[in-house]
Amino acid sequence: MLVWLASFLEQYFSSFHVISYLTVRAVLSLLTALLLSLWIGPKMILRLQIFKFGQEVRNDGPESHFQKRGTPTMGGIMILATITASSLLWGDLSNPYIWCSLFVLLGYGAIGFVDDYRKIKYKNTDGLIARWKYFWLSVVAFIAVFTMYMIGKDTDATRLVVPFFKDIMPQLGLFYIVLAYFVIVGTSNAVNLTDGLDGLAIMPTVFVAGAFAIIAWATGNVEISKYLYIPYVSYTSELVIFCTAIVGAGLGFLWFNTYPAQVFMGDVGSLALGGALGVIAVLVRQEFLLVIMGGVFVMETVSVILQVGSYKLRKKRIFRMAPIHHHYELKGWPEPRVIIRFWIISLMLVLLGLVTLKLR
């Protein structure tokens, strides 16, 4: 929005030209989301307490979690509001990929809101009925993916990029829609599963979003993409603004979500942030890189799949409890230790993912 205003004012005041620089807008997007979060946070927490939007806790979970019952949840509303505001302020609103990303973010946020509200209303951890939850997640994903496909079909925007191999970039055609759907829905649920401890999900999200800001810039730059042997995809450079907004909003939320948490993001936040990471990965053609950089999310999801599969087939559990962060809690690890170690793993995987851009 401010890009258009600055462009108009530039003819009268040349100093407004600085707003056209992507790097300047990226930093301002991050700071805007961060400062808005710090300003909104206390007010949001107070409102959630007034409305009695408190967290429900599983009765079969770790005993240390019982004290979390009643902690304000649905703080993800703050995350979505600040990401959206910052993206609209500093992004180029003529860019279709900004709108696709916001559509998934807000669409998944709405689904998460209903899920959270039902948990609070009925005072259990069930939430939205699973089949309806996945139905609406799928509807939002397919609308976004079909739009993205129509924008980029028959171009490098629908090629598959394989890490470590510079010459393997097959054209996906219609399979792009299938792959993109599973990436978006899968990542959304993976982040949702990870959001079980104070700050556990938000910091890896910040790391991955920050890395994707760099990748989006490279993918949208003709010379840099050619140098790195990745496909040049027009429109993606503007996703830097969206990514840095996620970083700023995430850090602002962490201020209140760090152990012991004053507020939880709830499904309204985790489903939306996961969907946002998924759609960014698809748009910059780095689905495989998301698996590497989002390794903590993958690990949490795989632990649940293995636990459920093992119990159904052998009537035995592999872990004391899944997702795997609960396994370590039940082994006696203090919650902050689990969180910080998972953050360290996440940071290492993100750095590894960035290195693979050059190792081809």
Swiss-Prot record:
It catalyses: UDP-N-acetyl-alpha-D-muramoyl-L-alanyl-gamma-D-glutamyl-meso-2,6-diaminopimeloyl-D-alanyl-D-alanine + di-trans,octa-cis-undecaprenyl phosphate = di-trans,octa-cis-undecaprenyl diphospho-N-acetyl-alpha-D-muramoyl-L-alanyl-D-glutamyl-meso-2,6-diaminopimeloyl-D-alanyl-D-alanine + UMP. Its cofactor is Mg(2+). CDD domains: GT_MraY (cd06852). One of its GO terms (cellular component) is plasma membrane. Keywords: Cell cycle, Cell division, Cell inner membrane, Cell membrane, Cell shape, Cell wall biogenesis/degradation, Magnesium, Membrane, Metal-binding, Peptidoglycan synthesis, Transferase, Transmembrane, Transmembrane helix. It is found in: Cell inner membrane. The chain crosses the membrane at residues 26-46, 73-93, 94-114, 132-152, 168-188, 199-219, 239-259, 263-283, 288-308, 338-358. This is Phospho-N-acetylmuramoyl-pentapeptide-transferase. The gene is mraY.
